[in-house]
Amino acid sequence: MEMQLRINEYWSKRSDEFADARYQDLHSQKKEEWLSVIRSWLPDKKEIRALDLGTGAGFFAFLMQELGCTVTGIDYSEAMIDNAKKVMGKLGREGIVFRQMDAQKLDFEAESFDFIFSRNVTWTLPDPEQAYREMYRVLAPGGCILNFDANYGQAFKKQDLEGITEKQAVSDTSGYENPARSLAMLKERNQIAAELCICDEKRPFWDVQVLASLGMKKITVDLAAETHFFGGKPVSEAEKAWYNPAALFMVAAQKETHSLKK
């Protein structure tokens, strides 16, 4: 099976699980923490066109809409997009455009967005460098890319080497229903990660190099991004059930404005 289709099949199987979890997140402290972080990186302009790249169930698309952005959310998984639309209806929201689309081949005109947000997406892509090129292409001058991710692939490889077990990797004590998080699904996730080239890179240093090569001049890195969340409190049982054994990092990059030639 082609890698992109294999990745799509895996995440589509988990789409209902993600929709339930993200809906809960919209009614938790996590929402306020993410709103604070995103707000601090939005461009200083009245009307902001925002792209949620790898929107999943739409959690961040809804947050950016609350912050006054005109939002488009894309995901390769049609199942994820369907769930994002369902959550939008459940919330009584409207106005967000959710589209099935490949992050590595964006169907948008150049300079269509002022702000591009992504979390836990680049590590899942067969060609993340191409995804960055596409983000740069559709980002308007003065716009910002804000990417949260982690070295998940390397962590999953380590799990496999240490001998992953279902008891260690899957928790049902949180109240979340995780039908897709079986041992078979976890092994499939790890096998996919092992075949993705990005999982052999040193991140976020690799991300910085790619963004700089595209022409980004102002790049900010936070190696301890997770410290902005959970309110300084111990990780809850719900979070333990969704635990990923890798530290979250942030990469923010701003595209230069056009300079007038004399």
Report each predicted region and the residues it spans.
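Short alpha-helix
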Residues: C197-G215, V221
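Conserved class I S-adenosyl-L-methionine
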Residues: M1-K46, F59-L63, N83, C144-A184, D222-A225, ...
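Class I SAM-dependent methyltransferase SAM/SAH-binding core
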Residues: L51-L53, A57-K105
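A short acidic, Gly/Pro-enriched loop at the edge of an enzyme's catalytic core
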Residues: Q104-F115
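Core SAM-dependent methyltransferase catalytic element
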Residues: L214-K217, P234-K262
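A short glycine-rich, Lys/Arg-flanked "PGG" loop and its adjoining helix->strand segment in the class I
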Residues: E129-P141
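A short SAM/SAH-binding and catalytic strip from SAM-dependent methyltransferases
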Residues: F115-P128
